[in-house]
Amino acid sequence: MVAIHKPAHDVILKPVVSEKSYAASDRGQYTFVVAPDANKVQIKQAIEEIFKVKVTNVNTLNRAGKKQRTRTGFGQRASQKRAIVTVAEGQTIDIFGN
């Protein structure tokens, strides 16, 4: 399957900054919120283009939005797609400002 080229900043929306993703950065894994229609090949190409690192593995997951109670009834948070990207040994991505 050939990936349709999208601009890198349309594929990678933002990094996930949390304690869990910070701990995973010690293992060379970084978590990003990505476009819902992005595939693993597009995510790999975008990370390599933006951060100039070698990506060895990409895992993706779809997080369903939670139902939220509002004043007028129920609503729902937006669903999002995340990618956990593993970079080559010895390479890092500075998304935590270290």
Swiss-Prot record:
Protein's recorded name: Large ribosomal subunit protein uL23
Gene Ontology cellular-component terms listed: ribonucleoprotein complex; ribosome
GO molecular function, a single term: structural constituent of ribosome
Gene that specifies this protein: rplW
Quaternary structure (record): Part of the 50S ribosomal subunit. Contacts protein L29, and trigger factor when it is bound to the ribosome.
Single GO BP term: translation
Task performed by this protein: One of the early assembly proteins it binds 23S rRNA. One of the proteins that surrounds the polypeptide exit tunnel on the outside of the ribosome. Forms the main docking site for trigger factor binding to the ribosome.
Pfam short name (any one): Ribosomal_L23
Key words of the record: Ribonucleoprotein, Ribosomal protein, RNA-binding, rRNA-binding
Recorded family membership: Belongs to the universal ribosomal protein uL23 family.
InterPro entries, A to Z: Nucleotide-bd_a/b_plait_sf, Ribosomal_uL23-like, Ribosomal_uL23/eL15/eS24_sf
Organism, scientific name: Bifidobacterium longum (strain NCC 2705)
